[in-house]
Amino acid sequence: MDRVCVIGAGPAGLSVARALKRLAIPYDQFERHTDVGGIWDLDNPGTPMYESAHFISSRKLSGFFDHPMPGTLPDYPDNRQVLGYTRGFADAYGLRAAIRFGTAVRDTETAGTGWTVTLRDGSRHDYRAVICATGVTWQPRMPTHPGTFHGEIRHSSTYRTATEFHGRRVLVVGLGNSGADIACDAAASAAAAFVSVRRGYHVIPKHIFGIPTDEFGARGPQVPIRLERPAFTALLRLLQGDLTRLGLPEPDHRLFESHPLLNSRLIHHLQHGDVAVRPDVARLEGDRVRFTDGSTDQVDLILYATGYDWAIPYAQRHFEWQDGRPELYLTAFSRRHRNLFGLGYLEINSSAYTVFDQISNLVAHYLRDQEHRPARAAAFDRLIATDHPRLNGGLTFVGSARHRTYVDARTYRRYLRQVCARIGWPTLTPGMFETVRASS
């Protein structure tokens, strides 16, 4: 049982595979689909991806460590470009060789100090560690409303292209980043478009003074949140004005206290009357929807952009769950079972790719030191058991399940570096993966 099992070959799974390969840790990787890429592959059954989807973090600040996105890509690459980049990453580091495609994991169970993994074909394999990296957007959350609806009801995970809206009166329920994108598609293609929201949001444009917003924030001085927030709030007000005049409710939280809604098209469509804002749905009445303010609209299609229930079906019982989120040290290490990991089970206010690389670095060194420097691994075991860092960066996030595991990227990265220094592990440095490049 000297091998490690990696489940999933999306961005998180590829990140940890590269880290394991660099330290010569033997591993097997299982992917139920026919290729790498995870949710970014429109052909991957169950993916929530749609044709108009783009990165909400910019090209320069996204991408894997030491493998930047090509400068020929736009500021915000689309889903096909992200998929191509991700597959290029797998090829650059020769990661496909260890992946068994078309192979789903059915179950995992403890076996002494290790794990037994059962595949869909019934075969069983023993490993010393299991790394779950299958993502969080595979089980759509569908709300229910009283009444009867004569039209079509779907979750946004089934949506692919704006042609689905032609000639229809569309209601999008929910205004996260996907909901906003889809509402904009409906605004341009549907006979009528509405978006139902329960709360107000701070809408952040994708560019500020022509610079991608995350780059704009990174270029300036890194000031405390008590100074940054009022300055950025004032800037947004200057650029956009009062969004309540467009029908959006006043936010019930301060800027940065919820996942950023990054969208430059939504304000345009609201300003031009292409999409109308409605409050929460109260009930369904045949071909009409009644809202909590008593108003009604005739609707043909209700599309719920209401998020996903997190699940790890093949290992669900091994994790401790609270408010629908797994309890993990540094968002990755199980406190209950040694050598059970969850990679990618976090919400963060930045691009996740480099964050995956940073946490993968810890996972790989921890696994290596269990065999080569057991005292160092034991020191990290004590941290897993006793360390409970606050990773919110001084922010008070809104009280929703989504924000329970939310971390501030700047704080998170800094703490990961501190842990590495404390244990004696190296942090990510340019050139450290050159030895495992396929061309090397």
Where are these regions (language model features)?
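Flavin (primarily FAD) cofactor-binding/catalytic cores of flavoenzymes
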Residues: 2-55, 68-178, 184-201, 206-207, ...
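Active-site segment of extracytoplasmic enzymes that catalyze sulfate/phosphate-ester chemistry
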Residues: 61-62
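Non-catalytic, mobile gating and regulatory segments of ester bond hydrolases
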Residues: 154-157, 386-391
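Short, surface-exposed amphipathic charged segments that create phosphate/polyanion-binding patches used
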Residues: 210
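Conformationally flexible catalytic loops at phosphate/diphosphate-handling active centers
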Residues: 217-218
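Extended, charge-rich low-complexity interaction segments
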Residues: 372-386
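Short, structured protein-protein interaction patches enriched in aromatics and acidic/basic residues
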Residues: 379-380, 388, 393-397
